[in-house]
Amino acid sequence: MFRLTNRLALSNLIKNRKLYYPFALATILAIAITYIFTSLTLNPHLDDLTGADAIKMVLGMGLGIVALSSGIIVLYANSFVMKNRSRELGLYSVLGLEKRHLFSMILKETVIMSFVTLLLGIGVGALFDKLIYAFLQRLIGESTGLVSTFQVMTIPIVLVIFVCIFSLLVLVNGFRLLRLNPLQLTKDGLKGEKKGRFLVIQTFLGLGAMGYGYYLALSVKDPVTAIMSFFLAVLLVILGTYLLFNAGTTVVLQLLKKKKSYYYKPNNMISISNLVFRMKKNAVGLATIAILSSMVLVTLVGAASIYAGKKDYLASSAPHDYSVTGTNVDLTSTRRAIDDFLVQTGNQVNRKVEASYLYFGIKEQEKNKLTIFSENERKVLPKSIFLVFSQSTYKQLTGKDLNLTSNQVGLFTKNKTLKDQKSLSVNSQTYQIHDSLNDFLKGKVPNLFTIIVSDYSYLVVPDMDDFQESIKGTATTQATYVGVNVKDPSHDAKKNSDLLDKITDKETQQLAGQTTGLPKSYFTANSRYDAEGMVNGFVGGTFFIGIFLSIIFMLGTVLVIYYKQISEGYEDRERFVILQKIGLDDLQVKQTIGKQVLTVFFLPLIFAFIHLAFAYHMISLIVRIIGVLNPSLMLVVTIIVCGVFFLAYILVFVLTSRSYRRIVSM
């Protein structure tokens, strides 16, 4: 019996190769991608790249997501394969093979498949390892020398991950065999799914879950809240999608059946009857396609927007080659730190910008009435941020004089409520809004608060001392900024950046009243060289992971669509043969198949685009933390991604439809 199960295992893989080819291809690609991620994460040459810490962190997180996604896809593909082999396994049981023999046979099939796919997957991963490393270097703006070395620990890690996945696969298949008798196995592939119960309740639950998920996505107003709400919104939308596909498709089909003018046409009747026959299975498959498609779109839109927007972020976060920001430090001290740096480096200044301002968070807002946090409420996340400048500083930055009187202010704001106001009250002190200003800090003074809150404002006051007196006792912070562009910024950029860090650290230590921990008064150094390294490393790594996650999600989408078409093709073949015998010609068969396929496979695409539309606001807030501050750019990226995905979906639809028609027409 041992030899018999050996022969059966090998022959079964050969006979069912049409089912196993996509399964094997998906597994090989998943193994190769996991190998590449593991190899890159362990690569010692990452330390030589600018922004190495950011790259390692992103790759480490990506490896976990890739491994989890790979496991889900392999298990899902296996379920389709075993479903289509139910009659075969039932026949073996009827012929005398016991369940332990069937389990032994399936175990050996899995061992053979795992050995072949692991061998090929690791081989493909090793083959493309250097190329992918060069691609990562290109994304983060480094030279593309192929410096990639074989890591001994890469193979054991990949083996552990996929041995666990294949072991789980064996357990799932074994449990499936144990709970079914031979008669059930022979009929399992043919029987239709049972009609769902409590359809009305399911429909309302689905609408409620999806509606609340959409509400969460649209109602968040700052990036931090968006991150905290994102996963809950995703879970609710996934739950709502499955419930609506399961119950909603049933309700719609039953309504169509009641519409006699539509239902009693040969093509419509056959298509609807076939969908009703497999109602529950179609619902789960379609919902899965919709969710996977949404994952592809969200991942690609987010990753591509981050990569496309990195230049804008660099321009706003590091507008100068070298700069020093003083927190609760006067402008003279900040200027002294940058002047000391210029003397030691001998750099010639092309441009110099200086600014002194204060900033605070808003605790409450009632139309144009603002309340600032008190000093003991500093740690509370503000609803919005205000940066306050004197009109003399405004004139230095813009060259324009506002000529404000004692009760007048100039205002630039992202707050929709304040944009239409004629006056502004700050802690009971009322000011007339004399001028509505443009963003006068852009390219001059960095405002890093934009990545924390999308609601921020710049206030220009006639006299800073008077304004500070009016808000005394509140949680405000003074800041000074001095930034310079030098004649040759690329010369000794790293050395100069390190020197500026040392100077600011020394100046910070010399400030009076220092305590352990984060000082109340301190200097912060920034250079475009360091900013580019950090941003390129993080953004390039994020885009790199986004591409590969999108490939995995797309792979899952294609697999589900392909196996769905194949499995339904085999199920429909016998029924269409019967219909042809009772008078349905070939043209009617093709029209009926076409209508069914169109209905089934374009509904998930519509849902995916709807999900993306409602998630767009939340995605835009999340990517703001990474520096995507240009809404127009993100919109263009989204349109391009949707167009490319639509074309890819059409291609998959055309290819899988041919397989379906070929099987049904046999």
Language-model-detected regions and their locations in the chain:
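Hydrophobic alpha-helical transmembrane segments of multi-pass inner-membrane transport and secretion
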Residues: 18-45, 53-90, 110-124, 202-204, ...
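N-terminal Sec/SRP start-transfer signal
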Residues: 1-31, 195-200, 209, 244-293, ...
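Short helix-loop junctions at transmembrane helix boundaries
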Residues: 39-53, 122-155, 211-228, 603-666
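Short cytosolic juxtamembrane segments of multi-pass membrane proteins
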Residues: 3-7, 179-193, 570-574, 661-666
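Hydrophobic alpha-helical segments
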Residues: 112-256
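Alpha-helical transmembrane segments and their immediate juxtamembrane interface regions
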Residues: 154, 235-254, 312-337, 626-662
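Basic-flanked hydrophobic alpha-helices used for secretion and membrane insertion
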Residues: 313-314, 320-325, 331-555
